[in-house]
Structure formats: structure tokens, C-alpha cells
């Protein structure tokens, strides 16, 4: 299930910062916790029970040193989960507390509407609405650190497959019957976003997915890759 949240900027010449994932995440979490603490625990789970998009600004101007100047009357935030209770709680919480603040910019929720979930097959073409994060760990000196992977990295596909199977098992309570899938990257753009006090690298891309329909559906509803609850890995079906 997925929803679109329309946000109305509350000042003239609004400029949206480039980095806002953690602000959106923390405000949604706080709003949901005020009415459904049990659901809020799912939202903060590392297994990724949900995902959300970048803030979609359909008419904009990029200001390299400042952010994104919003030239449209409103912007959109898409939120998705296979758990309808999560989406219901988010919609109710956001309607009850309709203010968002991102950097110096305040928004008011103008509308919330359900988006029709499309039927998927064994082969689909997806486009990302927020970057896909795939990570591994490496030793540097005597320290273990996270290493973000891009699609051209040798470990990317193997790590993505393992992450999706693990997340599916944790969220759905069972392992997928078909675990095999491949992706063919058709377009790719690397990203680096500040989330809290750390940078996270990810991949905006269009990709052809083939294989497990269970994992395709799970990724479509809950996001592909890691850190989906922090606003990564959301996709839309384009073919």
C-alpha cells in the first residue's frame, strides 16, 4: 500500500535543502508514536518495514550552494509499506499533526491520497524514487567500517540479494519460496546524502528486474536495499 502526501511550503521563494532524510523520518516517527507507539517501533526497525521517496519537486531550480528552489505550489512525498496498519497510522498521524519543518522551511500537509498498487510479474522495469543503498563491511587498518556499493561493484548484486532475502524473512515472517533474481541497470546516477551525522551513498537508477515475484513485490512495497526506513530504496513501476 502506498500514499502520496502533498506538502505546501509556507513561505515565498522556498528553498528545500538537499539533505533532509533524517528530518522527514524523525518527524513521521514522532507523529506516529503519539498515536500508535507499537507501529512507531516497526518504523524504527532496521529491517525496513516501510520506505519513503525523495520529496518530489516537479517544478524547480537547482541552487548548487543552497538547495532546490521550489517553483511549484506544492511538492509530493510518497510513502509505502506492505503493512496496511503502518500506512494507516502514518496517514492518521500526519493528518492529526500536519506540519513538517525541513531546515528553515515549513510545510503544511495539503492532501493525502492512496496510490493504486500495480500488478507485478517475473520481469519488471523499476525507476527509483529514492536511492538504493547496498553496503558491505571492510577492514581499514584495525577498524571495521561500512562501505557503500554501487551497481558496478563486484559485490553489489550478491549483497543486494542477501539483504532482500533477510529483510523479507524478518518482515514477512517466512523465507521467500523463490530467492533468485537479477537486475540489469539501464540508467544510473550516484548520490551522497547526509543522514543525521553520517553520509550515505546510494544509487538512483532505472533497472530491469527478473526473477522472484515475491521479492519483486516486497521491494516494490517496502523498498530495495538497506536503510529503507530512512528514505531509501523506494521505486515505481514503469514497465
UniProtKB/Swiss-Prot annotation:
GO terms for molecular function: hydrolase activity, acting on ester bonds; RNA binding. GO terms for biological process: defense response to virus. It comes from the Archaea. Gene3D superfamilies: 3.30.70.1890, 3.30.70.1900. Monomer; homodimer when crystallized in the presence of crRNA. Varying the crRNA sequence varies degree of oligomerization and structure. Belongs to the CRISPR-associated protein Cas6/Cse3/CasE family. CRISPR (clustered regularly interspaced short palindromic repeat), is an adaptive immune system that provides protection against mobile genetic elements (viruses, transposable elements and conjugative plasmids). CRISPR clusters contain sequences complementary to antecedent mobile elements and target invading nucleic acids. CRISPR clusters are transcribed and processed into CRISPR RNA (crRNA), also called psiRNA (prokaryotic silencing) in this organism (Potential). This is Putative CRISPR-associated endoribonuclease-like protein Cas6nc. It comes from Pyrococcus horikoshii (strain ATCC 700860 / DSM 12428 / JCM 9974 / NBRC 100139 / OT-3).
Amino acid at each position: 500500500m502506498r500514499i502520496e502526501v502533498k506538502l505546501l511550503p509556507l513561505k515565498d521563494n522556498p528553498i528545500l535543502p538537499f539533505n533532509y532524510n533524517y528530518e522527514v523520518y524523525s518527524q513521521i516517527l514522532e507523529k506516529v508514536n503519539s498515536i500508535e507507539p507499537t507501529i512507531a517501533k516497526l518504523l524504527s526497525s532496521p529491517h525496513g518495514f516501510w520506505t519513503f521517496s525523495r520529496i518530489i519537486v516537479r517544478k524547480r531550480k537547482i541552487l548548487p550552494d543552497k538547495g532546490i528552489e521550489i517553483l511549484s505550489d506544492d511538492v509530493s512525498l510518497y510513502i509505502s509499506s506492505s503493512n496496511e496498519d503502518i500506512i494507516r497510522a502514518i496517514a492518521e498521524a500526519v493528518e492529526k499533526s500536519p506540519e513538517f519543518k525541513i531546515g528553515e522551511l515549513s510545510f503544511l500537509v495539503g492532501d493525502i491520497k492512496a496510490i493504486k498498487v500495480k500488478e507485478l510479474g517475473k520481469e519488471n522495469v523499476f525507476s527509483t524514487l529514492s536511492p538504493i543503498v547496498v553496503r558491505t563491511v571492510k577492514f581499514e587498518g584495525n577498524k571495521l567500517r561500512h562501505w557503500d556499493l554501487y551497481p558496478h561493484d563486484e559485490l553489489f548484486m550478491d549483497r543486494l540479494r542477501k539483504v532482500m532475502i533477510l529483510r523479507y524473512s524478518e518482515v514477512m515472517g517466512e523465507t521467500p519460496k523463490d530467492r533468485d533474481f537479477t537486475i540489469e541497470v539501464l540508467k544510473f546516477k550516484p548520490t551522497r546524502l547526509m543522514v543525521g551525522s553520517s553520509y550515505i551513498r546510494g544509487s538512483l537508477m532505472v533497472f530491469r528486474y527478473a526473477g522472484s515475484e515475491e521479492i519483486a513485490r516486497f521491494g516494490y512495497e517496502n523498498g530495495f536495499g538497506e536503510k529503507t526506513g530512512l528514505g531509501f530504496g523506494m521505486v515505481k513501476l514503469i514497465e
